Amino acid sequence: MNISDPLGDMLTRIRNAQMRGMSKTTSPASKLRARVLDVLTDEGYIRGYAEIEKSGHKTLEIELKYYEGQPVISEIKRVSKPGRRVYSSVSDIPLVRNGLGISILSTSQGVMSDNAARAKNVGGEVLCRVF
């Protein structure tokens, strides 16, 4: 199966698994996906993830997080897509729900949250937003 948007596929897998109340989900591994999951873990949106190798293929096993039976992530949405890339300078990085959520950016200094990008004074491609 050919996936045209691998990051969007992972975000959809997370969204679908949380709607079903699952504790874990899997996604094919890549460096970008792992860096996005690092940000989600650091910000407290998921419990963590592990890279597992099965029959020569690496997959990411993502542990989802719930609070009082409800998913911690109420919205996870792709912003920059393969057909329409969205870039933002440091002064134009969007606030998600007046600062209650985060944007995840791919910058020249790596993948990071919007708050980290503002602190390091760098802009970049807005990959997704999480609330």
Curated annotation (Swiss-Prot):
Instruction: List the PROSITE patterns hit by this protein, alphabetically.
Output: RIBOSOMAL_S8
Coiled coil as a keyword of this entry, yes or no, is no
Taxonomy of origin reads:
Bacteria, Pseudomonadati, Pseudomonadota, Alphaproteobacteria, Hyphomonadales
Subunit annotation:
Part of the 30S ribosomal subunit. Contacts proteins S5 and S12.
- InterPro entries found in the cross-reference section: Ribosomal_uS8 (IPR000630), Ribosomal_uS8_CS (IPR047863), Ribosomal_uS8_sf (IPR035987)
Report the sequence similarity comment from the record. Answer: Belongs to the universal ribosomal protein uS8 family.
Q: Which organism is it from?
A: Hyphomonas neptunium (strain ATCC 15444)
Q: Which UniProt keywords apply?
A: Ribonucleoprotein, Ribosomal protein, RNA-binding, rRNA-binding
Note one Pfam family from the annotation.
Answer: Ribosomal_S8
Q: What is this protein called?
A: Small ribosomal subunit protein uS8
The UniProt function text for this chain reads: One of the primary rRNA binding proteins, it binds directly to 16S rRNA central domain where it helps coordinate assembly of the platform of the 30S subunit.
Which molecular-function annotation in GO is an example for this chain? rRNA binding
* GO CC annotations, alphabetized: ribonucleoprotein complex; ribosome
Give me any GO biological process, just one.
translation
